[in-house]
Amino acid sequence: MARIAGVDLPKKKRIEYGLTYIYGIGLFTSRKILDKVGISYDKRVHELSEDEAAAIRKEIQENYMVEGDLRKQVAMDIKALMDLGSFRGLRHRKGLPVRGQKTKTNARTRKGKRKTVGAKS
């Protein structure tokens, strides 16, 4: 099993899809990396030689922010929005949708389980 950027890639998948298991690398970026390194998209992860895996590791390390560093950067960006007091920061703080979706109905993922308000007994 190839280990790249601290992630074990699935052995039997094609390398272009295997790289997408790394946080911060999607299909487009995966193909860009493979083009730059000169590896075919059709190659399977378990078919990679040690030199090819090292070349992919080097390319990702030098040119892309992935995994822990990227997660940390995203968290810091959200914290900065909240500290600024921007509209988006307030929405993050309140746990509501940030991108203008309606909230009278739906938005359950962000709002959580329904809470009954003002039930009379």
UniProtKB/Swiss-Prot annotation:
Keywords: Ribonucleoprotein, Ribosomal protein, RNA-binding, rRNA-binding, tRNA-binding. InterPro entries: Rbsml_uS13_C, Ribosomal_uS13, Ribosomal_uS13-like_H2TH, Ribosomal_uS13_bac-type, Ribosomal_uS13_CS. SUPFAM superfamilies: S13-like H2TH domain. One of its GO terms (cellular component) is small ribosomal subunit. GO terms for biological process: translation. Residues 95-121 are annotated as: Disordered. Pfam families: Ribosomal_S13. One of its GO terms (molecular function) is rRNA binding. It comes from the Bacteria. Located at the top of the head of the 30S subunit, it contacts several helices of the 16S rRNA. In the 70S ribosome it contacts the 23S rRNA (bridge B1a) and protein L5 of the 50S subunit (bridge B1b), connecting the 2 subunits; these bridges are implicated in subunit movement. Contacts the tRNAs in the A and P-sites. PANTHER family: 30S RIBOSOMAL PROTEIN S13/40S RIBOSOMAL PROTEIN S18, SMALL RIBOSOMAL SUBUNIT PROTEIN US13M. NCBIfam families: uS13_bact (TIGR03631). HAMAP family: Ribosomal_uS13 (MF_01315). Belongs to the universal ribosomal protein uS13 family. Part of the 30S ribosomal subunit. Forms a loose heterodimer with protein S19. Forms two bridges to the 50S subunit in the 70S ribosome. This is Small ribosomal subunit protein uS13.
